[in-house]
Amino acid sequence: MQNSESHDFANAQSKILVLGATGATGRLIVSQAVARGYDVAVLVRSDEKARGLKGAMPIIGDARDATALREALRGRDAVVSALGTPASPFREVTMLSTATRALVDAMKAEQVSRLVCITGMGAGDSAGHGGFVFDKVIFPLLLRKVYADKDLQEAIVRDSGLDWVLVRPSVLNNKPSRGAIRALTDLSGFHGGTISRDDVSQFVLDQVRDDAWLHHSPLITW
């Protein structure tokens, strides 16, 4: 879906929609986007949820609702999805794939082509590269069902026909940004890592304008 129109905003103020804006990483994405001078809209479930998202325009609605998504997308250039869901060892998880499927349909309807979507280390072909504790303890006990939905989410994005980037952070922490990170698609010899939410947010926002990782799924880590 990449064409000249997908670059029209490269030299102008980017108008982005952030999903998952009330999560720990989502809040950093919003604040950093505002600091960059972006026009930021957020889709949140209530006005109360939008508190603290300074400089962003709140739109009330559910990320799985087609009508709310189309309203939120109107006039936007790009979408950043930082949607997450709690660890769920027992119940089935469908929120990420359901919301992403609805998002893709709404983006096509509103002719918004750029999607930067955060999933995580362990999704898709990064499975088995989380290190011993993550792969052998955390993943099977807490995250198996969440990652089954992340895998489906990634497949929906890959098959969307949009100008997408899938971002797979390693284990997240709240430490200050280091500035320098590694973005990997060849995971040979890689087994585990960590990265700050601050650095993840910066990398994700860079993908709104940059085509370097278009149609790729980099794992990002320190």
Predicted regions and their residues:
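NAD(P)H-binding glycine-rich loop region in Rossmannoid oxidoreductase-like domains
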Residues: 16-17, 48-102, 106-109, 208-212
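N-terminal Rossmann NAD(P)H-binding glycine-rich loop of SDR-like oxidoreductase domains
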Residues: 16-36
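SDR active-site strand-loop-helix element
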Residues: 19, 43, 82-83, 115-121, ...
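Conserved Rossmann-fold NAD(P)-dependent oxidoreductase catalytic core, especially the SDR/UDP-sugar
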Residues: 39-41, 45-47, 90-91, 101-145, ...
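Substrate-positioning beta->alpha
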Residues: 95-96, 167, 195-205, 216
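Glycine/proline-rich active-site loop of Rossmann-fold NAD(P)-dependent oxidoreductases
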Residues: 125, 176-181, 207-216
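Conserved beta-loop-beta element that borders a ligand/cofactor-binding pocket
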Residues: 154-175
